[in-house]
Amino acid sequence: MEYGEEPPIKRTRRSFLMLPDDLVLNCLARISRLHYPTLSLVSKTFRSLLASTELYQTRILLGRTESCLYACLRLRTDSELLHWFILCHRPHSSKNVLVPISSPSFTSPSLPGVVVVGPDVYAIGGGSKNKNVSIYATGSKTYNALSSVMIMNSRSHTWHEAPSMRVGRVFPSACTLDGRIYVTGGCDNLDTMNWMEIFDTKTQTWEFLQIPSEEICKGSEYLSVSYQGTVYVKSDEKDVTYKMHKGKWREADICMNNGWSLSSSSSYCVVENVFYRYCEGEIRWYDLKNRAWTILKGLGRLPSLPTSHSNVKLADHGGKMAISWEEYMFVDREKKIWCAEIAIEKHQNGEIWGTLEWFDNVFISKTPNGYVGLVHALTATVW
C-alpha cells in the first residue's frame, strides 16, 4: 500500500439471522406459507422460527391469512392408513408439489367425514376392523363404526382428539355452518333422534338434531353441503334433497336435486355462495335465478378431466376453485395427481366464468402397480 492510500475495507459476511428477532419474524411472516417447507431445510434455527408461536402471532398482527390446500391419499402398501399432504411450491421452481405432513395414527378402511373450520381440519368417524364397537354393514363389507373425532391444527400440523360423537358413523357426511359441524348418516337404523349430530366448535360439545319425519332419515349414506346460509342434505335411499329452513326440514328445488348425487361424492363445492359440481368432464354451477345447472365457461386451457367422479375433487380455495384429480399412466404404470386453480368472475349479465391460473402434476406414486387413491382435497385458512 502506497503512502497516503486508504486501507482496504474489510468485508464481513453478515447473516440474515444476525438481524433483530422482531425484524426476522416480520420478514418471515410476509412470506407465503407455501415456501415454509423449503425454508425449514435451511437450518435448525429457521426450522424453529417457522414453528414458533411468535411467528404465528406476527402473521395475525399483519393480517397474513392465506388458503392452504390439503390432500388425503390412500396408498395400497398400507391401504387402511390415510396419508395427509399439503400443497407447497417446489424448491427452485415455480411449480407446486404435495409435501407429506403428520397423519393420525388410527387406521380406517372406510372414509371418515372431513371438514374445515378456520385453521382446523376435522376427521370424523370412519370404520375399523379391530375395535369392539357398533357394527355397520354395507354391501358385502362389515365395519365397526367409530365415533372418534381427530383435529389437525394446520399451523403446526399436529393431531389431537376431540370429544367423540354420541353415535359411531362409518361413512358420515359432514358440512359446516357458522362454526358448527353438521354430521349426517353413516350408521344403520337411523331414526329421528340420531339421524344428525351437531358439534359446536366453540364449546366443543355434541348434540342431536331431532327431526319431525322418519321419511327424511331413511337411508344410511348422505351428501351434505352448506349453501345459501343453510344446510342441504341428500339421501342414498330417496332421490330427494332436503334443506333446513327456520329450524324445519323441507324438500329443496327439484332442479338443484338433479345436479348432484352420491355417485359424485366430494365432486362439488360452494365458492362465494355459488354451488359448483363436477360431472362427466364438465364443471357446472347452479343458477339460482333460472333454476338450472350451467356450464362454467372459460376453461378451455384446463386439461381433460377423468369422467369418473371419484377421481375429481373440488374445493373452495380462498374465493377461487381448486381442482384435484387422478391420472393413471398405463405405460409407466404410475398414478399421477394433478391440481389446478381457477379464478372465478361473476359478470353483470348473471354469467359466471372461470380462468385457469395454473395446473401442475403435484404427486407421482411410487407404490406397486402405481396405485394411489385421492380421498379428500380441502382448504384451510391459515395465519
Curated annotation (Swiss-Prot):
Kelch repeats lie at residues 134-179, 180-226, 267-316. It comes from the Eukaryota. Keywords: Kelch repeat, Repeat. InterPro entries: F-box-like_dom_sf (IPR036047), F-box/kelch-repeat_ARATH (IPR050354), F-box_dom (IPR001810), Kelch-typ_b-propeller (IPR015915), Kelch_1 (IPR006652). Residues 13-59 form the F-box domain. The keyword Chaperone does not apply. This is F-box/kelch-repeat protein At4g23580. The lineage of its organism: Eukaryota, Viridiplantae, Streptophyta, Embryophyta, Tracheophyta.
